[in-house]
């Protein structure tokens, strides 16, 4: 013989089995897609969602309520069974309707449309007034039935809060906003004035730097002019030096080949670039000293071969 709550226990068992089937289906789908997962995490997520949908949609309470009715009928308590005689008359039709209703409820719950929103939408409807922006809120038959059954309550805290909102001191609010605006205005003006001072100082520094650059450029131009003058003077001096040496060389009683060699060295002096000219003069002087040294050695050797002695200095 069945126990008093056997049908209710079977309904709870079916709900638990449905949850386990949902967990297995979720993990199997993840495995087929090759996605790594944490079983405990999946189990916890599915349980939270499953419990919310079953409770918010009313499916769990609906199934357990029908199971309780069956248990009462099996235990000769026909009060609930008589109230549900239409359901008992055609169980297959009622089961199909319950299945569709439960499916729709769970779909709405999974989409975020909870029980509160469903009840409010079922209790009220909105009627637009043509030509106006306002509308009329109409109570449905469900709302009227709830009023008759005493299932509607008035939240006094909401009324008190509303009254408190209606007594807001708008003058003090305006004064506070005005003070905040003045404070913000003063801060903006202060920042603007600081920016103007910084910009003015930067402009002065820029003009001062431009003056320094102009002075430096003028000084550089003066140095360039002086340098050009020195370069021209050196070129003239070098030209005069080479001309004087050539004239003096022509007045000497030297061998023509020696004169030609010395003239060639003098003509090789660069009179355009003073730096190169000094290098050329150094080379000419070195060659003259070398020639003089060779001549002295030759003269010394000649004196020694003639058994003569030589000395330097004046007696």
Curated annotation (Swiss-Prot):
Name of one Pfam family that matches: Rota_NSP3
Per UniProt, the keywords (alphabetical) are: Coiled coil, Host cytoplasm, Host-virus interaction, RNA-binding, Translation regulation
Superkingdom of the source species: Viruses
Query: Single Gene Ontology BP term?
Result: regulation of translation
Name where it's found.
Host cytoplasm
Show the segment(s) annotated as Interaction with host EIF4G1.
208-315
- Gene Ontology CC annotations of this record: host cell cytoplasm
Q: Where is this region: Interaction with host ZC3H7B?
A: 170-234
Q: Do you know which InterPro entries this protein is assigned to? A: NSP3_N_rotavirus, NSP3_sf, Rotavirus_NSP3
Q: Where is this region: RNA-binding?
A: 1-149
Which residues fall in a coiled-coil region? 166-237
- Residues of the region (Dimerization) are 150-206
Q: What is its main location?
A: host cell
Give the GO molecular function terms.
RNA binding
Name the protein family: Belongs to the rotavirus NSP3 family.
State its role.
Answer: Plays an important role in stimulating the translation of viral mRNAs. These mRNAs are capped but not polyadenylated, instead terminating in a conserved sequence 'GACC' at the 3' that is recognized by NSP3, which competes with host PABPC1 for EIF4G1 binding. The interaction between NSP3 and host EIF4G1 stabilizes the EIF4E-EIF4G1 interaction, thereby facilitating the initiation of capped mRNA translation.
Assembly with partners or alone: Homodimer. Interacts (via the coiled-coil region) with host ZC3H7B (via LD motif). Interacts with host EIF4G1.
- The protein's name in its UniProt record: Non-structural protein 3
């Amino acid at each position: 013989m069945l126990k008093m709550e056997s049908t209710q226990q079977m309904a709870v068992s079916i709900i638990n089995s449905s949850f386990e089937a949902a967990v297995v289906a979720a993990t199997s789908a993840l495995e087929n897609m090759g996605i790594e997962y944490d079983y405990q995490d999946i189990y916890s997520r599915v349980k939270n969602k499953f419990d919310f949908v079953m409770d918010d949609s009313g499916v769990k309470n609906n199934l357990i309520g029908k199971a309780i009715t069956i248990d009462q009928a099996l235990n000769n308590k026909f009060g609930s069974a008589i109230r549900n005689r239409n359901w008992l008359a055609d169980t297959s039709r009622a089961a199909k309707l319950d299945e569709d209703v439960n499916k729709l409820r769970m779909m709405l719950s999974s989409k975020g449309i909870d029980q509160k929103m469903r009840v409010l939408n079922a209790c009220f409807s909105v009627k637009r007034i043509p030509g106006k922006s306002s509308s009329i809120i109409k109570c449905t038959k469900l709302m009227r039935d709830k009023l008759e059954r005493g299932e509607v309550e008035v939240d006094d805290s909401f009324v008190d809060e509303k009254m408190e909102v209606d007594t807001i001191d708008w003058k003090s609010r305006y004064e506070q906003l005005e003070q905040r605006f003045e404070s913000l205005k003063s801060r903006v003006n202060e920042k603007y004035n600081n920016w103007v001072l910084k910009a003015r100082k930067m402009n002065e520094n820029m003009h001062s730097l431009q003056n320094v650059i102009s002075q430096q450029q003028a000084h550089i131009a003066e140095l360039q002019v002086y340098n050009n003058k020195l370069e021209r003077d050196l070129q003239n001096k070098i030209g005069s030096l080479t001309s004087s040496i050539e004239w003096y060389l022509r007045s000497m009683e030297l061998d023509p080949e020696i004169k030609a060699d010395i003239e060639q060295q003098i003509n090789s002096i660069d009179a355009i670039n003073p730096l190169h000219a000094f290098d050329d003069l150094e080379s000419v002087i070195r060659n003259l000293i070398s020639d003089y040294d060779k001549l002295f050695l030759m003269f010394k050797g000649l004196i020694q071969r003639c058994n003569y002695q030589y000395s330097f200095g004046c007696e």
